[in-house]
Amino acid sequence: MSFLVSKPERIRRWVSEKFIVEGLRDLELFGEQPPGDTRRKANEASSESIASFSKPEMMSSFLPEGGCYELLTIIGKGFEDLMTVNLARYKPTGEYVTVRRINLEACSNEMVTFLQGELHVSKLFSHPNIVPYRATFIADNELWVVTSFMAYGSAKDLIGTHFMDGMNELAIAYILQGVLKALDYIHHMGYVHRSVKASHILISTDGKVYLSGLRSNLSMISHGQRQRAVHDFPKYSIKVLPWLSPEVLQQNLQGYDAKSDIYSVGITACELANGHVPFKDMPATQMLLEKLNGTVPCLLDTSTIPAEELTMSPSRSIANPGLNDSLAAGSLRPSNGDSPSHPYHRTFSPHFHNFVEQCLQRNPDARPNASTLLNHSFFKQIKRRASEALPELLRPVTPITNFEGSQSQDHSGIFGLVTNLEDLEVDDWEF
């Protein structure tokens, strides 16, 4: 009489059966953790380089029970409006967290399978620069995913609200170093990230850099062997098209590998430096043609913008696409003594320009891997840990709040944050 079972219960059973086959107990969705070591080694026959990675000590986990969380204000939606993102308080410790609640009843089986892959990867990965999931469980007909609240938001939030003409080079170096460390780990684990962009780079209260967007990760290991290339086109990828490499976009028999993420790092570097992503607002077909024809985005500064244009004051209503061409004539006006200086009248180091050029090589085989890039001269300027230097480099930006010492009875400070929280594109963090 299975037809009498409610849809939420059917979904719960479907998810339960599916996750048990793939290692449900490792995912701990229902809070049932048997004694002993139950962490399943995914892809057991994978390469030695994958097996050699040790698991560093990470943030402690939270209890997988809905009653342990006091949901406060809604700070975002996403996943085709099936996901609600709440600021919440974890009652046992008083820590403020982000709770992503996904309505499983409205999800298709394909969506649930998609989420299953994300949660499996979140349990498999353990790295200081990959956003940790503090708890994952099912409450009623909802999947709850709990993560720490990232008080600086994403790198996209920062350039969208404070650094609209781009960040300074040293801040970018710290951010990209954290991203490359995460990618080096992900690639050694046999995965391609496929969604590196500023909105998937989260920065915590103490200035630590985390790569998110695990939902798009794809394993390159099949039947115990690492494949030379994969051919799967990322699902729900409309938001990441400007960051995708030419070989991913063209979808041919040659496929792509982890070097496609390196191209995305180059695009993200331009995004952070210029204040907007290259190919912004360009139709998808034109974007593909530009990339296949070898159009290379660049950093906008005195070495890439003609001197005569640097004497003009650009209208902020029209952004330069960052494609190594001149600014649109309609976006310029003569500069006089009262006009502000050109926002791109700055000079990035030759090391930074070379770093971007290396990442954006049209031929993926010519791009360095993440490990090699971490030794690039661009990162020689880093002298301190990101947690020590980044908060200073992001000034005058301050974390939205650190929530320390807040009492559950007094939420006046919390609800006073709503205006600031609305500026964050939390639905695009994808945690």
UniProtKB/Swiss-Prot annotation:
GO terms for molecular function: ATP binding; kinase binding; protein kinase activator activity; protein kinase activity; protein serine/threonine kinase activator activity. InterPro entries: Kinase-like_dom_sf, Prot_kinase_dom, STRAD_A/B-like. Keywords: Cell cycle, Cytoplasm, Nucleus, Phosphoprotein. The protein kinase domain is predicted to be catalytically inactive. Belongs to the protein kinase superfamily. STE Ser/Thr protein kinase family. STE20 subfamily. Component of a trimeric complex composed of STK11/LKB1, STRAD (STRADA or STRADB) and CAB39/MO25 (CAB39/MO25alpha or CAB39L/MO25beta): the complex tethers STK11/LKB1 in the cytoplasm and stimulates its catalytic activity. This is STE20-related kinase adapter protein alpha. The lineage of its organism: Eukaryota, Metazoa, Chordata, Craniata, Vertebrata.
